[in-house]
């Protein structure tokens, strides 16, 4: 391993020990905000510190085994130990390289999830409902909180569009690769001939930004309409214009929110989604420029990005970005998504490592 990388790892290991000491300090414990920030930093440094400690131990093992090679009686055993230690050292170096990759600052944030029915009419709306249920199950398993911001139901069930905020540890980092087109192939319940239909939905995942980082939105650029809510909320919903529709005139982005009884709360929610959408549009432009020079696994939430096909008759799900096919569709639709999410994260890390080695 390069001396510059070892020096960086030593500094991170020292910082990990320093943060550990600070977390036990009475002044830190009294300051809840600082305590939370240090706890997050400690968690982020723990893996790299542990891995580096293991690597240091293996280097000592290699040194010991090399010294034993001079002893004729110990040579054979030393050769075995040396081979094992070198293999372990290589594995740990690869892990450390991944742990040192630049982190996306948005990865730890909450996220807005949008699922929209595309081509396929009623069947697309039903599939949008299935996808939202799949993500909700996944969130539940990870102990994340799902809060519906806005929903437009399909005529025969499912959703034409649904927007939810998902809160918890590392939500955006896990879900960001879901953005893009999701295609379903199955026999609709209304199909009497048993023919397979193909429908599509688009998914967009955007990080929730803290107020300080929200893009500046000029109030003059907004058209705000109020209307009567339709949906849950008891008798109150249809008696006041509590639902909000905000149009951002320069970009044409429209956000609706009718989940809360209070117009003020709906407006605040709609503005937070609008800020995230404007930020996402800016990020997509930047990624497009990057994608012209390098493969980009992050979808834009556009229908043209074909992420996955869910084939119900075959019980098959295929991720087209990494040519991964699994025959466990029922489990996937029940929210067991890690088997699809992990490989795409690993592929993304491999791309990052390739980009770094090219720069070097």
UniProtKB/Swiss-Prot annotation:
Gene Ontology cellular-component annotations: cytoplasm
Keyword ATP-binding: no
Sequence positions bearing N5-methylglutamine: 235
Domain of life: Bacteria
A GO MF label: translation release factor activity, codon specific
UniProt keyword list: Cytoplasm, Methylation, Protein biosynthesis
Post-translational modification: Methylated by PrmC. Methylation increases the termination efficiency of RF1.
Residue segments, region Disordered: 284-312
Location relative to the cell: Cytoplasm
Function text: Peptide chain release factor 1 directs the termination of translation in response to the peptide chain termination codons UAG and UAA.
Similarity comment text for this entry: Belongs to the prokaryotic/mitochondrial release factor family.
Entry protein name: Peptide chain release factor 1
Naturally occurring in which organism (per UniProt): Escherichia coli O81 (strain ED1a)
Gene that encodes it: prfA
């Amino acid at each position: 391993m390069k001396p510059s990388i070892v020096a960086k790892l030593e500094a991170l290991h020292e910082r990990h020990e320093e943060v550990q000491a600070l977390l036990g300090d009475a002044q830190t414990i009294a300051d809840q905000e600082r305590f939370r920030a240090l706890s997050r930093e400690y968690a982020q440094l723990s893996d790299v510190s542990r891995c580096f400690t293991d690597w240091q131990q293996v280097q000592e093992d290699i040194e010991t085994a090399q010294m034993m090679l001079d002893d004729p009686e110990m040579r054979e055993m030393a050769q075995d130990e040396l081979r094992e230690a070198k293999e372990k050292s290589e594995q740990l170096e690869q892990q450390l390289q991944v742990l040192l990759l630049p982190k996306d600052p948005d990865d730890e944030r909450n996220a807005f999830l949008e699922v929209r029915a595309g081509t396929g009419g009623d069947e697309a709306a039903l599939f949008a409902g299935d996808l939202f249920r799949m993500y909700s199950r996944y969130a539940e398993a990870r102990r994340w909180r799902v809060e519906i911001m806005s929903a437009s139901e399909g005529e025969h069930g499912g959703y034409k569009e649904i927007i939810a905020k998902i809160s918890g540890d590392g939500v955006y980092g896990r879900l960001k690769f879901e953005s893009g087109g999701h295609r379903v192939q199955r026999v609709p319940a209304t199909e009497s001939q048993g023919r397979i239909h193909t429908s599509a939905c688009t998914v967009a995942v955007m990080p929730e930004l803290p107020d300080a980082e929200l893009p500046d939105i000029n109030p003059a650029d907004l058209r705000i309409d109020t209307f009567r809510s339709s949906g849950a909320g008891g008798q109150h919903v249809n008696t006041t214009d509590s639902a909000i529709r905000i149009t951002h005139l320069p970009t044409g982005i429209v956000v609706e929110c009718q989940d809360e009884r209070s117009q003020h709360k709906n407006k605040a929610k709609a503005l937070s989604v609008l800020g995230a959408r404007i930020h996402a549009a800016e990020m997509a432009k930047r990624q497009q420029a990057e994608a012209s020079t390098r493969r980009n696994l992050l979808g834009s939430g556009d229908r043209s990005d074909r992420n996955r096909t869910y084939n119900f008759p075959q019980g098959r799900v295929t991720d087209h970005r990494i040519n991964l096919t699994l025959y466990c569709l029922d489990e996937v639709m029940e929210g067991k998504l890690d088997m699809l999410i992990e490989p795409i994260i690993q592929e993304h890390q491999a791309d990052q490592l390739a980009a770094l080695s090219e720069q070097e």
